[in-house]
UniProtKB/Swiss-Prot annotation:
PANTHER family: KELCH PROTEIN, KELCH-LIKE PROTEIN 25. This is Kelch-like protein 25. One of its GO terms (cellular component) is Cul3-RING ubiquitin ligase complex. It holds the Pfam family BACK. SMART domains: BACK, BTB, Kelch. PROSITE patterns: BTB.
């Protein structure tokens, strides 16, 4: 005799083995839930009544507690409602919204539309129907527009919908010149406004837009808000304002001169502006930090893998224009920008000698100069700017006594360059030495993705350096081992693309450096090994690379809002990109 799932008796066959039959009805949970809903509608076995406005909703405590941590806590932790047979939300909850949530609890289905999405998000968060809250947030994401993104930013911040907040914030940054004219803008909290104006991704080529926006916000409620003006001013890139605008602010804006603190801020901005225009040393002031939309894209490359020229990308004309020759052609170097200067570090020269040299290109004055040499000659390394200093990571150096230079094992050593002192110092070495890795900075930390190990294997680790305690940690594993990838940063998101295998060459991923979580994004338009990527505005740009014998001949753009890649322009056949940087576009006099 076989044993049904409902029986507890056991039996054995003649061979002594257990004979069991398990019956499973997949639709049983739906049937039970549907019948409970019928019982609810007929007020059968209900043991609590919810009130919203003037409407009553008889329910089963067990169903509510199973659907919502809010109700589970209410009914089980000795609260008054755990003994009463009614729970009255009064006017804190609209009856139609509560009805929708109860229908979801009893059916697992809910209809979300433009009229109820915001209310469902708020109520779902309040009553801890988190699935409904997240579904409403996803609906609102898909219906974001410049006319509602500020409101969505405020709503999502209040209800811990981080993804909707980032999407809303990103749209507000892209359309800042439009949204700052809306009534929602004047209703922003100080902290939300501060979050917007402090971001590098705010899209404007004229910092006067930001300057005028904060004055507008303060004047909307002058008595309450004037105390916030110094903090807001410190997050405007005042040194990027035209000189006549700064002078006009001093002479014609009484609000700025009414407070000693704001006067000191304006004076500091003037000094910074003068220092830049006179090319008087390195400027690291936050007043002079350009927005990403105020950047230009520079490609370093040549007709061979030996780089000898800088090219500028003209977005509007969709052209790539030669700008300047490198003083010393080289290959396998690294390049990064700090403000208006591009730092070219190390590499190998025409005779394959490994270099310590550091060449600096000033994009404002279009001049080359030499900085202090690195402490270690290296090639195949990575570099990134972090808090106005340059970090050089990993790579190879040459084996002593061998000519031409042969690569050593991958280096662990990391160097830091301070432009103010023109001096290199060693910082803590990496946990694992790597070369050909993707190196970027985000959230005041340095991130190194993959690379080639000391054993010449591909690496799958994400190594992270925190300068505040001079320590490296392993943050996560990459989706697969990587080398010859590109990386670029938008906010707290790091985008990684390309690689040297069939599987990784066209793939792209997003890494959240706050949660250490990976998300696969849309594939690139072509397979790219040794490509180069930068962020500008709220988009990513990728150039160069090859796969097999095929060179990639396009400059492509990724829009994270739509998760799509598009070709911007073709790269001249005579240009093989070796590095790609984003630096100041212009400095208004």
């Amino acid at each position: 005799m076989s044993v049904s799932v409902h029986e507890t008796r056991k039996s054995r066959s003649s061979t002594g083995s257990m004979n069991i039959s398990v019956f499973h009805k997949a639709s049983h949970p739906d049937c039970v839930l549907a019948h409970l809903n019928t019982l609810r509608k007929h007020c059968m076995f209900t043991d609590v009544t919810l009130w919203a406005g003037d409407r009553a909703f008889p329910c089963h405590r067990a169903v509510l507690a199973a659907s919502s941590r809010y109700f589970e806590a209410m009914f089980s932790h000795g609260l008054r409602e755990s003994r009463d047979d009614t729970v009255n939300f009064q006017d804190n909850l609209h009856p139609e919204v509560l009805e929708l949530l109860l229908d979801f609890a009893y059916s697992s289905r809910i209809v979300i539309n433009e009229e109820n999405a915001e209310s469902l998000l708020e109520a779902g968060d309040m009553l801890q129907f988190h699935d409904v809250r997240d579904a409403a947030a996803e609906f609102l994401e898909k219906n974001l527009s410049p006319s509602n993104c500020l409101g969505m930013m405020v709503l999502s911040d209040a209800h811990q919908c981080r993804r909707l907040y980032e999407f809303s914030c990103r749209m507000s940054l892209v359309h800042f010149e439009t949204v700052r004219q809306s009534e929602d803008f004047n209703s922003l909290s100080r902290d939300t406004l501060l979050d917007l104006i402090s971001r590098d991704e705010l899209e404007t080529e004229d910092e006067r837009v930001v300057f005028e926006a904060i004055l507008q916000w303060v004047k909307h409620d002058l008595e309450q808000r004037k105390v916030h003006l110094p903090l807001l001013l410190r997050n405007v890139r005042l040194a990027l304002l035209p000189s006549d605008c700064l002078k006009k602010a001093v002479s014609g804006e009484a609000l700025l001169m009414a407070d000693e603190c704001t006067k000191l801020i304006i004076d500091e901005a003037f000094r910074c502006k003068t220092k830049i225009l006179l090319n008087d040393g390195v400027v690291t002031s936050p007043f002079a930090r350009p927005r990403k939309a105020g950047h230009t894209l520079l490609i370093l490359g040549g007709q061979t893998f030996m780089c000898d020229k800088i090219y500028q990308v003209d977005h509007k004309a969709k052209e790539i224009i030669p700008k300047a020759d490198l003083p010393s052609p080289r290959k396998e170097f690294s390049a990064s920008a700090i403000g208006c200067k591009v730092y070219v570090t190390g590499g190998r020269g025409s005779e394959n000698g490994v270099s310590k040299d550091v060449w600096v290109y000033d994009t404002v004055h279009e001049e080359w100069s030499k900085a202090a040499p690195m402490l270690i000659a290296r090639f195949g390394h990575g570099s990134a700017e972090l808090e106005n200093c340059l970090y050089v990571v990993g790579g190879h150096t040459s084996l002593a006594g061998i000519f031409p230079a042969s690569p050593s094992v991958s280096l662990k050593q990391v160097e830091k360059y301070d432009p103010g002192d023109n001096k290199w110092t060693m910082v803590a070495p990496m946990r694992d030495g790597v070369s050909n890795a993707a190196v970027v900075s985000a959230k005041l930390k340095l991130f190194v993705f993959g690379g080639t190990s000391i054993h010449r294997d591909m690496v799958s680790k994400v190594q992270c350096f925190d300068p505040s305690d001079n320590r490296w940690t392993i943050k996560a594993e990459c989706p697969q081992p990587w080398r010859y990838t590109a990386a670029a940063v938008l906010g707290s998101q790091i985008f990684i693309m390309g690689g040297d295998t069939e599987y990784t060459a066209a793939s792209a991923y997003r890494f959240d450096c706050e949660t250490n979580q990976w998300t696969r994004i849309g594939d690139m338009t072509a397979k790219r090994m040794s490509c180069h990527a930068v962020a500008s505005g709220n988009k990513l740009y990728v150039v160069g690379g090859y796969f097999g014998t095929q060179r990639c001949k396009t400059l492509d753009c990724y829009d994270p809002t739509s998760d799509t890649w598009n070709c911007i322009t073709s790269v001249p056949y005579s240009l093989i990109p070796t590095a790609f940087v984003s630096t100041w576009k212009h400095l208004p006099a």
